[in-house]
Amino acid sequence: MKTSKPLLTLRMLFPAAASFIVLLLGEWIARGSLTADTFISFIFPHFGAYLLAWLLLFLVWELLDWVLRIPPLATLGMAVLGCAPCAVNFYTMQLRGEPFLPWDLMQVSEAAGVASAAGLKLQTSMVVSIVLVLALTVASFFVYRGRLRQRWLPRLAGTGASAAALCLLIFGVYLQPAVTQVLGITPDAWMQDRYYRYYGV
């Protein structure tokens, strides 16, 4: 059965739109609020950083979709990657007044116990994010329902291209201070919370 043009267009736009929504949800979770001032003071002046974050989420979705060929799982996986670090950062700031740092991953079990003892609760932003992520996941099922199965060669090529683009973004941009500074992202090791406010988690 031939796929209609509107549906093909929707399938092309869905990953980009879902990644954008998850990016906004992550910022809402990390900051606790997402106001006009947030956009004016932090997001718009550092647009390049948020464009890179969106591109990262988009490429993660594409890679998961090429590997799994199950769009709801690709959507859910991308959303977890986009929102979970933001939630951890929010609670870390609440508990100790310091932002989440990569080496904090080594203390996950300890942090979970402390968070439980401190009586931390789900924030409105987190509840709304869970609902919207579930809605996106369900929507992806209906948008891609009936999609033709890919043969192994195009699937392998798509997986390789997505993985290569993701590696290029991580190792060629994110981990290259000279490149990030050209994009207006300046390292701020002494004030990681300020870095997150400017450029996102």
Task: Give the residues covered by each predicted segment.
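Transmembrane and membrane-interface helices of multi-pass
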Residues: K2-Y196
